[in-house]
Amino acid sequence: MSIARITMMEYLSEKDVVASENFYQTIQKDWFGNAQAIINVRTGPTSLLSLAVYSSYADAESNLPKRKEFQGIVKDKFTIVDSFYYEGDITDFEASKAKEIKAEWKN
């Protein structure tokens, strides 16, 4: 069963959110390439929610060292105020209109 890891991050400024997202784009495939899907959502001017889907708990745990490294970088370099995550089994998933989803990347 696939699992989801939901990470919440709160930054000091909107500038830090943008810089962190830009940095994330440069490492995502190398550091978190084992994710089946990743959706990042700006939940406010200084906050970000990241939803990552993995094939199993073992697969999700395999990138925890890189996640810890990423969290350290964003804490020091981009002034992250708070960060925590939840994870659990995916109990329902509907993506019949996945091709209609539009993502806008802001630099």
Regions found by a protein language model. Name each.
Residues M1-L49, S55-E69, D76-N107:
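Short S/T/G/P-rich N-terminal loop/turn motif that feeds into the first structured element of a domain
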